[in-house]
């Protein structure tokens, strides 16, 4: 089978898994020689279809920003996926569990850009100058791969295991906050389920954002004004078992809530 046929076939398998809410075997089993280029090509097929169907691209998410997770998956870099407007929910707006497969939540810092990032090598100064503000965020990650049995190839192809996201409503200028010092707690009904801080995200969320900005320029699709960037998890992700509300509090950025309904 040619690479083009394999790309189309695996992209279709992921779409079917999402529409049926039935997980599939790891894609790497069908393509053991698959590399990052092939995985991103699979992701792009499905992203292009979403755009062709009228969905609006609003930004990017960065994954694998934890050194421990990178080691687990045998990679030395993060990955990225696409964010569409259809994936965005408001603070406390109910998200139907029936639309998800095996969801988990993680607390993150989101950056909203006000300028394009077109330099081949972006500095912290470039990022700070291009960012309108930061927000607390919760990403709902989900995997179409059975039992979350993923490696780098699987998660990249699966839009970096992204599903939905919720942004907080307290915009903060980067000059007014130290992103590395942002302590995070993720709770449900007052029980702390996850803790972390900004250093968990490649040492500084701006490191992750710089990596993404450089990568997107190399791909010919630079980050643009208005884009949302989810910079990566500040602590361990938490499986969503049933309907309920998860609250992420990030010091300096306030709180944001992800609510799930049956």
Curated annotation (Swiss-Prot):
The keyword Lyase applies. GO terms for cellular component: cytoplasm. Keywords: Aromatic hydrocarbons catabolism, Lyase. Its cofactor is a divalent metal cation. Pathway: Aromatic compound metabolism; 3-phenylpropanoate degradation. The keyword Nuclease does not apply. Its EC number is 4.2.1.80. Disulfide bonds: none annotated. PANTHER family: 2-KETO-4-PENTENOATE HYDRATASE, ACID HYDRATASE. Belongs to the hydratase/decarboxylase family. MhpD subfamily. NCBIfam families: PRK11342.1. Catalyzes the conversion of 2-hydroxypentadienoic acid (enolic form of 2-oxopent-4-enoate) to 4-hydroxy-2-ketopentanoic acid. This is 2-keto-4-pentenoate hydratase.
């Amino acid at each position: 089978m040619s690479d083009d046929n394999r790309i189309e076939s695996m992209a279709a398998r992921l779409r079917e898994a999402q529409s049926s809410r039935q997980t599939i075997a790891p894609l790497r089993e069908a393509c053991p020689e698959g590399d990052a280029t092939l995985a991103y090509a699979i992701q792009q097929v499905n992203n292009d279809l979403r755009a062709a169907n009228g969905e609006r691209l609003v930004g990017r998410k960065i994954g694998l920003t934890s050194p421990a997770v990178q080691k687990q998956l045998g990679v030395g870099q993060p990955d990225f996926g696409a964010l569409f407007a259809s994936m965005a929910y408001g603070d406390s707006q109910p998200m139907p569990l029936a639309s998800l497969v095996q969801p988990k939540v993680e607390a993150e810092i989101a950056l909203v850009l006000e300028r394009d990032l077109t330099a081949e090598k972006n500095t912290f100064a470039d990022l700070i100058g291009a960012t309108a503000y930061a927000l607390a965020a919760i990403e709902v990650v989900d995997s179409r791969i059975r039992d979350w049995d993923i490696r780098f190839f699987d998660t990249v192809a699966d839009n970096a295991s992204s599903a939905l996201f919720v942004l907080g409503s307290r915009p903060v200028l980067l000059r007014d906050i130290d992103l590395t010092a942002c302590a995070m707690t993720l709770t449900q009904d007052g029980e702390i389920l996850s803790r972390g801080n900004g250093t968990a995200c490649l040492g500084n969320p701006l490191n992750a954002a710089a990596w993404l900005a450089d990568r997107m320029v190399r791909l010919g699709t630079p980050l643009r004004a208005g884009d949302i960037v989810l910079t990566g998890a500040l602590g361990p992700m938490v499986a969503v078992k049933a309907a309920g509300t998860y609250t992420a509090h990030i010091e300096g950025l306030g709180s944001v809530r992800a609510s799930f309904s049956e």
